[in-house]
Amino acid sequence: MKRNAILLSLLTTLFLLPGKAVGQNTSSDGKLVYNFPFAPSEGLVNRTEKEYRKEICLNGYWDFQPVALPGSYVQGKGVAPELSLPKEGAWSKTRIKIPSPWNINSFANRNVEGPDHRNYPSYPKEWEQVKMAWMKKTVTIPNDWNGQQIKLYFEAVAGYTEVYINKEKVGENFDLFLPFSIDITNKVAAGETAEVWVGVRSQSLFENNSTIGRRIVPAGSMWGYHIAGIWQDVYLLALPKVHVEDVYVKPLVSKNMLELEVTVQNNTEKKTDLQLQGKINEWVNLAGTDVNSAPVPAWELGQEALKVAPVKVSIPANASTKVVLQVPVSGELSYWTPEQPNLYAVLLSLQAKKEILDMKYERFGWREWTLQGTTQYLNGKPYQLRGDSWHFMGIPQMTRRYAWAWFTAIKGMNANAVRPHAQIYPRFYMDVADEMGICVLNETANWASDGGPKLDSELFWEASKEHLKRFVLRDRNHASVFGWSISNENKPVILHVYNRPELMPQQKKAWED
């Protein structure tokens, strides 16, 4: 408790400096106004890619329609009610602000009325008890997106999610914390409008109290299992039909080798022959040093450090190909460490008949974590980690500003590591950690401390495996991430809360698989 009080004091000090220092003033109606963006960000498409890739951020006002639970529904039976389609003329007069859970005002709202989580006073009180709902947004597809692959991209939606385009279902998702995308190329047309429906059922509707536990998906701690709705960014993306789908950067420091595992996607009707090539540049941090400017992304590419030699790639129609590129390193790259968090940018291009088809950017650090016994090694040398850990507590943490303040406090205590606890944090936490030199023990949303996960359910374990896989794929290129915590307190809960030691072999096998 004392440690938490100290950390809270440090965080408060960082934000509550004199008004002039933090850009605050008082408006004519007596409101305290902060004159800088609450959540500064760069978007999904990097500026080096924008000649070839496009995006429209769909954040902002959406229409909202609550759906009542049927009278026959019984909580805790493991069978969720069906989500009926939205009704014409039944949309709420109050629009929802995306990203935000629709029941946000009920989080941490017991005897103390929040206090700092009542961030959406316009939301009707009845939304706090809604368990399933629809959200609607109309968007116009730009004329210059003709011939592109078009995707809807969600950074995170809490609940069982169904997505419709122009009243036709195009996809679904049931993970509360991780990104997903849906190809809608054949459902929309350049120059025309599209109506997006997103239907969400709270994970609590799927809970099963028949034996031990109740939650059938990894749902995190207090924040995760409570919220419902679109709680992170939404984008509409346009990609070239032939593009780099994924880049896995492997900094093999001990072998003096940088390995790039590149997946190239061909969404055309014919085989494509092309050339894959690239370069590696210094990533230079230009962020400010005061409390307002330091959390704001600001950078430029520095000198070219290495070239990625061109290779020929042949991709069948409507298929993908994985290419492994190896770049020898002989002192051209400086180590990433907490003391010197040097970063680099990989820039890969696809070229056919001297025409560049696509450009892909990926940031990384030249570092390698290894274990010898119980000792952590960073770049071949023993490295001691001193860290902090905390639960995710909602809207105040939905900004790089909080990550910067938290990590600044950690650095100020002569520490260098963090464990974002009990759920998957938004990816900008890892971005800031990369830039500030904070070592991250990433943790899944498999949090068992309240006895909530249904650890005897095959549904839970299948969801957990997919959850872990998607988590690693999201964060594996971050220089700051040194490990993966796959669960929290599962063993003591199995042994001392459930009193079911026979479940231990099942858990061990699930993670081994």
Predicted stretch roles:
Residues M1-N4, L8-S9, A21-P420, V432, ...:
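Secreted/periplasmic carbohydrate-active enzymes, especially glycoside hydrolases
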Residues R201-Q203, Q423, A445, S487-K491:
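Catalytic metal-binding/acid-base residues of hydrolase active sites
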Residues E435, F460-D513:
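Active-site neighborhood of glycoside hydrolase catalytic domains
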